[in-house]
Amino acid sequence: MKIAINQPAFMPWPGYLDRIARVDHFVMMDAVQFERGSFINRNRIKTQHGAHWFTVPVKLKGHTQNRICDVPIDDTRRWQENHAKQILHAYSRALRFGENSKALELMYGCKHETIAHLCCHWLSFWLVEYAITTPWSLMPRTFTVPGKTEQIIEICQALKADGYLAGPLSRDYLDLGKMEKSGIAVEFHDYTPPVYPQLWGPFIPGLSILDMWMNTETNPWRES
């Protein structure tokens, strides 16, 4: 069985979903430390001014050493209203804005205590939208070993996985020798996003899946 492991990501780019679609099981790594400036609570959409960050505010005071699954969302910032305005301005002319607006309204109307819960909710939504049937689960809440490679090995062994589809950035830290010694074959997921029609000028890759969802009816995973 081949698995993939990734931290939660708010409205992730298409490559996040592509990696999930190519494995037998996906594990969301939410019991590790929250990283400032990551994609856990933000991503980019395309506006008339180019790529633009939209962010879910979180309460980090007193939580900087806490796990992602423990970091609360800051609902005092009225972020749902801000996102609604940003999405309206960016995508009101998009091909699928009309048919997708109600789903967005329903999703944004749900309340979540933590950023991990929010990311889980959105992940379930995107998997259904794009007919990706890969089962997924949250990571174990405790580790018996330190180190990134060792943690990955432990998760693989817990799931009896003999294959691991790694993200390209894991080349910087993944110990391939330890993985091989543990009987886990490693592949790297080098993803090239599809080019699709966008508003506001030349194509910009690497945006949130929201951009592709709004601009095209194409499902690259159903058609691959």
Regions found by a protein language model. Name each.
Residues 1-224:
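Residues lining hydrophobic/aromatic ligand-binding pockets adjacent to catalytic sites
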